[in-house]
């Protein structure tokens, strides 16, 4: 997942590649001599230049690496557009992030459902009762959904109430009861908001970048999601 290498080696057949993707070594390329006879090996017209790794168009911004198979695609900045780029730069502004862990899920459904889920502001206050009970995301939050000019990407922005406290009972704003009326935390300070200069207001920004990337900033935590379809034609 990370590290520093001077070359890339396929563990299966030990083909080695330079960091620019060019093939630089093939074991037994000339075959193996046995009993005066050469067995195996690559054909005489084998040219390493024709067997390099697939080259990608790469862009790096704020320490985040993006890659595309389409070398004619517009720049990353133009692809995001100024509206979404503003929230991306707010999140990835060069400060050091600490990776706390990884989570992988296999979902039997259309890959677009994950993108739609992040854009939907109605379900958090109805489905996620923990959010409702402790005022993390409720219908009375100040929220808005912003999109790029081509409606490919979106940022759902939400700000908790005054001083980060929810007012009124959960059922007052959700029209549903919390999962457990007496639910409480042993240490309420777990939910305290510790403002950081880069926030500039929102306590949660959920970004979707079409077609397969999601960035979620919720209070002081950040999570990224990468959708990887595995169906026919993926």
Language-model regions, residue ranges each:
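Rieske [2Fe-2S] iron-sulfur-binding domain
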Residues: 1-71, 78, 82-85
């Amino acid at each position: 997942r990370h590290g520093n290498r001077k070359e890339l080696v396929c563990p299966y057949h030990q083909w080695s590649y330079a960091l620019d993707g060019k093939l630089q070594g093939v074991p037994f390329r000339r075959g193996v001599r046995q009993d005066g006879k050469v067995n195996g090996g690559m054909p005489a017209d084998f040219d390493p230049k024709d067997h390099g790794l697939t080259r990608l168009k790469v862009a790096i911004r704020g320490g985040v690496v993006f890659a595309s198979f389409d070398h004619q695609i517009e720049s990353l900045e133009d692809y995001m557009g100024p509206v979404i780029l503003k929230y991306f730069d707010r999140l990835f502004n060069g400060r050091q992030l600490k990776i706390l862990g990884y989570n992988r899920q296999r979902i039997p459904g259309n890959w677009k459902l994950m993108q739609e889920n992040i854009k939907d502001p109605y379900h958090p206050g109805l489905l996620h009762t923990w959010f409702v009970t402790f005022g993390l995301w409720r219908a009375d939050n100040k929220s808005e959904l912003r999109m790029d000019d081509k409606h490919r990407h979106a940022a759902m922005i939400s700000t908790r109430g005054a001083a980060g406290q929810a007012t009124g009972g959960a059922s007052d704003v959700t029209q549903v009861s919390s999962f457990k009326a007496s639910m409480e935390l042993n240490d309420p300070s777990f939910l305290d908001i510790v403002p950081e200069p880069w926030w500039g207001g929102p306590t949660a920004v959920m970004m979707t970048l079409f077609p397969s990337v999601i960035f979620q900033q919720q209070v002081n935590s950040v999570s990224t999601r990468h959708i990887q379809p595995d169906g026919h034609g993926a």
